[in-house]
Amino acid sequence: AMSTAELGKSLAEMIRKDKVHILTCTGANLEEDVFNLVAHNQYKRLPNYRDLSPSDELELLNNHFNRVTDTCIPEEAAFRRIEDHLLHIWEKAKSEGKRYFPHEYMYQLLLSGNLEKFYEIDPKDSWLLAAAEKDLPILVPGWEDSTCGNIFAAHCIEGTLHPSITKSGIEYMIYLADWYRDNADPGIGFFQIGGGIAGDFPICVVP
C-alpha cells in the first residue's frame, strides 16, 4: 500500500541523497512501485471508498482492479506491460544457471530500459528505480506472496522455470546477518516499507 500511496515521491530523493542504505519491504510494495511507474494513468481513485457496496466491490473485481483503500490498482494492465520482459529475465537466468534475489530481478528489469516507453510518472518519483541506480540491498521476505511471485510459481508449475533461480528468504536472512555485521558501525539508514513480515524479518536477524 505504501508504494501505491506514492511513497516514492519522498523516499526516492532520500535514496539519492544517501540517507538510506538498505531497505526491507513486502513483495507487494516491491512490485507496486513498478506498477505505478508504468500504469499510473489507469489507476482508479475512490475518495468515497467507505461508501462502496458489495456490488460496487464486485464490479471493481470484475474489471480487474485491486482496491487498496481509496486507490484501485489495474494489476492486469500493469503486469501485462512488464510480464514479457520479466519472463525473459527469468528465462535468461535459468539458461545461464544463475540465481538472484527477487529485488535483483526487478533491478535488471528497470535498468534494462525496456520499460521506459511505458512510464506514466516522472521516473524520479520511483523509489525502486532510485534504489536500483544505487544498487541498494532490499530484503523482500515472503516475495512469493505477490503478483509477480504468483506468476513465477505458475511458470514453475508449468515447467518453464525452476524455483531455484530465485534466492530464498533464508538466503535473504543470511545475507542480512553478514551485511549488518559489515555495515552497522557507525550507523545505517534502514528503511522499512510495509508491515508484518517486512518488519519482523530484520528484527529476527539483528540479535
Which residues fall in each region the model found?
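Conserved catalytic alpha/beta core of Sir2/sirtuin-type deacylases, generalized to analogous enzyme cores
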Residues: 4-207
